[in-house]
Amino acid sequence: MSYRKLGRTSAQRKALLRDLATDLIINERIETTEARAKELRSVVEKMITLGKRGDLHARRQAAAFIRKEVANSETGQDALQKLFSDIAPRYQDRQGGYTRIMKLGPRRGDGAPMVIIELV
């Protein structure tokens, strides 16, 4: 199984992908580098598939990966609740392909290719 190392140790890489996945679930659209977005895509697709399954085991598997951050301060809903109650039902009839990557220009400081990754 291949993956991108993203210039980090395995623990740092896992933490980065957890943070990005949680942010994408909360905001439904983030701007990041192309390599990070391509790695993030597979992680988020798996989380949404767990959300579609909806049983207790799937919820616990997703909770082990998604960070406990508040998604909506008015309702007190966290990222996991948003995944299972808002995002997963939206894709109930869709078999994969829940994200879209749109290319932007290069980043000003180092010229890294930037993209916007969003939920379809």
Curated annotation (Swiss-Prot):
The keyword Ribosomal protein applies. InterPro entries: Ribosomal_bL17, Ribosomal_bL17_CS, Ribosomal_bL17_sf. Keywords: Ribonucleoprotein, Ribosomal protein. The keyword Transmembrane helix does not apply. One of its GO terms (cellular component) is cytosolic large ribosomal subunit. GO terms for biological process: translation. GO terms for molecular function: structural constituent of ribosome. HAMAP family: Ribosomal_bL17. Part of the 50S ribosomal subunit. Contacts protein L32. This is Large ribosomal subunit protein bL17.
